[in-house]
Swiss-Prot record:
Its cofactor is Zn(2+). Seems to act as an ATP-dependent zinc metallopeptidase. In the N-terminal section; belongs to the AAA ATPase family. In the C-terminal section; belongs to the peptidase M41 family. This is ATP-dependent zinc metalloprotease FTSH, chloroplastic. SUPFAM superfamilies: FtsH protease domain-like, P-loop containing nucleoside triphosphate hydrolases. ATP binds at G293, P294, P295, G296, T297, G298, K299, T300. SMART domains: AAA (SM00382). It comes from Nicotiana tabacum (Common tobacco).
């Protein structure tokens, strides 16, 4: 930085200037149109003997200087290292027009000469590697001292300053230092800081291990948690919930609609309470009882009822809790569970969703290890192995009995398989009564009608129905739940919520009305078909309208469907397209019947390939028998029939669909007046119930359709 005292604006013939100090020199600012900077070295310089006559006293000079110093003066540097003698610099003649009147013929006192700082060297304590190399090549570095690991060095410059440098992996560095005459040494020991870092590095594995141990301990509930040990050892401990005196709050009185299953389980409870009654006759206590049934039928609820009724220690767990992160954990947890159970015998062990570990052992495809296999092998051994499990009854629940291993289902392990099926009408009435407790109902609520409208519903479905009805009543700010809320809740569960805010044009409303009228008209006039329960053109979910049929209770429970029923079902599905063609013409049909076509094709192909309802194919099942590929039962899918047979199947399917289409067309064209009345009623009211719909048929004197088979016989 240029010194303003050396510029042409400074007045005087000769000025003694000291070399710059190693640190940044602070300056005073003068109030003048052009500011001049005066270093402290000049302020402290002793006056020259030749010019001492023209210099005022020190007090006068100080008063003169400080009178022109701004209030923002900075402190002067006090560092005074010894330096060579000052040199004389000739100042250029100043322009008298721009000179400062306070600077003419003044010689300032300077302190003792300070050490001269090499301007080519950085003034920081940490140098960059490039700066270090430049200084070495210019001969500015006297010696270097490397750290023990060679990652850093400390240098001493020729002017005595010291700095540190981070050293990269440079193989030529030693040669460069030696060529430039730099003294090289290596530190014999680490500094305190490096020693601390090395100590931490040596202790890090132990700290990490202690941290992991602490995390395992916390995850397992701390010392004395599950299993009694805490920490990593709990991985092999069972996570089952134990109740010495079960308090589930559920008894057999709370279970409705599963009378046969309750009877089977009540015997198990009685066996635990009164074993002498059975042992006197030579009977042995069952070792296991498997609850099988669709989801939501109350299998877990029955197990809770057994726990509440038995009065013996009760262990409960989910099968998915056995298999976890490490290999062998599943088998270890099974052993631990049965060890605890045997110590509390007689007792009950309940395993929910046992198919998670009880699946059939696979064919070994893939070459990997399946942890479930070790788990199920241990479970088989504990239930009926060499040592047995006297006094321990195992209850298990699953909705996939088809995938369970056959060794698990044999007598001696699961002696009883209790089927918990969907409830019938009487069972649904009892379930509705149970789930209506605590709910305010109006007098028009008829549980029998609700039960008949909900065939195939499980206990969980009915519980959800009553809960949705209560929510609807609260939304409508009602004090009681009426049949309307229950009906709306049922439709909401089946098809989704109403789209009340949807803007529907008159043309679309008319189209949807004829769609649903076509379904209802064909279904009502087909013999032995399900009666119409309700018709609606209010959009719900993805559907623009819905026609509700009430399925036969007997048909649903038995699962037996006649050929005429399936043909009627296809005709009902095609009624929408037929009505659209008759009313709007062939050129104006829409894609609204696409889902109906998929349903019709599926039913027709099942009739030909699986059900033996084709004269040309006969009583032959076409296609593979199915199976689970992951169990090794069916490793590839291949056709077991020829191309000629496939052509025959396609022709038979097409014939069944065309026959259903002709039947639907005949019904709609014959009763076109009823179709118009029903569509107009739907446009006006948007919803028509079954009773109002049947009144149209009575007024129109509609007749049931005579089946195709009857015509052929005539």
């Amino acid at each position: 930085m240029a010194n303003s005292l050396l510029s042409s604006n400074f007045m005087g013939s000769q000025i003694f200037v000291s070399p710059p100090t190693p640190k940044t020199t602070k300056y005073f600012h003068f109030h003048s149109k052009r500011k001049s900077l005066i270093p402290q070295s000049i302020l402290n310089k002793k006056p020259n003997s030749d010019n001492s006559k023209n210099i005022p006293s020190k007090a006068a000079l100080a008063a003169l200087l400080f009178s022109s110093i701004t209030p923002h003066a900075y402190a002067l540097d006090n560092t005074t290292p010894t330096v060579p003698t000052p040199r004389v610099i000739q100042a250029e003649a100043a322009n008298p027009t721009t000179s400062n009147p306070f600077s003419q013929n003044i010689i300032l006192n300077a302190p003792k000469p300070q050490a001269q700082t090499n301007p080519e060297l950085p003034e920081v304590s940490q140098w960059r590697y490039s700066e270090f190399l430049n200084a070495v090549k210019k001969g500015k570095v006297e010696r270097v001292r490397f750290s023990k690991d060679g990652s850093a060095l400390q240098l001493t410059a020729v002017d005595g300053r010291r700095a540190t440098v981070t050293v990269p992996n440079d193989p030529d560095l030693i040669d460069i230092l030696a060529m430039n005459g730099v003294d090289i040494s290596v530190s014999e020991g680490d500094s305190a800081g490096n020693g601390l870092f090395n100590l931490i590095g040596n202790l890090f594995p132990f700290i990490a291990f202690a941290g992991l141990f602490y995390l395992f301990q916390r995850s397992q509930g701390g010392p004395g948690g599950p299993g009694g040990l805490g920490g990593p050892m709990d991985f092999g401990r069972s996570k089952s919930k134990f109740q010495e005196v079960p308090e589930t709050g559920v008894t057999f009185a709370d279970v409705a609609g599963a009378d046969q299953a309750k009877l089977e389980l009540q015997e198990v409870v009685d066996f635990l309470k009164n074993p002498d009654k059975y042992t006197a006759l030579g009977a042995k206590i069952p070792k296991g009882c498997l609850l099988v049934g669709p989801p939501g039928t109350g299998k877990t609820l029955l197990a809770r009822a057994v726990a509440g009724e038995a009065g013996v220690p009760f262990f409960s767990c989910a099968a998915s809790e056995f298999v976890e992160l490490f290999v062998g954990v599943g088998a270890s947890r099974v052993r631990d569970l049965f060890e605890k159970a045997k110590s509390k015998a007689p007792c009950i062990v309940f395993i929910d969703e046992i198919d998670a570990v009880g699946r059939q052992r696979g064919a070994g495809m893939g070459g990997g290890n399946d942890e479930r296999e070790q788990t199920i092998n241990q479970l088989l051994t504990e239930m009926d192995g060499f040592s047995g499990n006297s006094g321990v009854i195992v209850l298990a629940a699953t909705n996939r009995p088809d995938v369970l291993d056959s060794a698990l289902l044999r007598p001696g392990r699961f002696d009883r398989q209790v089927t918990v099926d969907r409830p019938d009408v009487a069972g649904r009435i009892k379930i509705l009564q149970v789930h209506s407790r605590g709910k305010a109902l109006t007098k028009d609520v008829d549980f029998e009608k609700i039960a008949r409208r909900t065939p195939g519903y499980t206990g969980a479905d009915l519980q959800n129905l009553m809960n949705e009805a209560a929510i609807l009543a609260a939304r409508r700010e009602l004090k009681e739940i009426s049949k309307d809320e229950i009906s709306d809740a049922l439709e909401r569960i089946i098809a989704g919520p109403e789209k009340k805010n949807a803007v529907v044009s008159d043309e679309k409303k008319k189209l949807v009305a004829y769609h649903e009228a076509g379904h209802a008209l064909v279904g009502a006039l087909m013999p032995e078909y399900d009666p119409v329960a309700k018709i609606s053109i209010i959009p719900r979910g993805q559907a623009g309208g819905l026609t509700f049929f009430a399925p036969s209770e007997e048909r649903l429970e038995s699962g037996l469907y006649s050929r005429s029923y399936l043909e009627n079902q296809m005709a009902v599905a095609l009624g929408e397209r037929v009505a659209e063609e008759v009313i709007f013409g062939q050129d104006n049909v829409t894609t609204g019947a696409s889902n109906d076509f998929m349903q019709v094709s599926r039913v027709a192909r099942q009739m030909v390939e699986r059900l033996g309802f084709s004269k040309k194919i006969g009583q032959v099942a076409i296609g593979g028998g199915g199976g689970n590929p992951f169990l090794g039962q069916q490793m590839s899918t291949q056709k077991d029939y020829s191309m000629a047979t496939a052509d025959v199947v396609d022709a038979e399917v097409r014939e069944l669909v065309e026959r259903a289409y002709e039947r639907a067309t005949e019904i709609i064209t014959t009763h076109i007046d009823i179709l118009h009345k029903l569509a107009q009623l739907l446009i006006e009211k948007e919803t028509v119930d079954g009773e109002e719909f049947m009144s149209l048929f009575i007024d129109g004197k509609a007749e049931l359709y005579i089946s195709w088979v009857s015509k052929e016989e005539d």
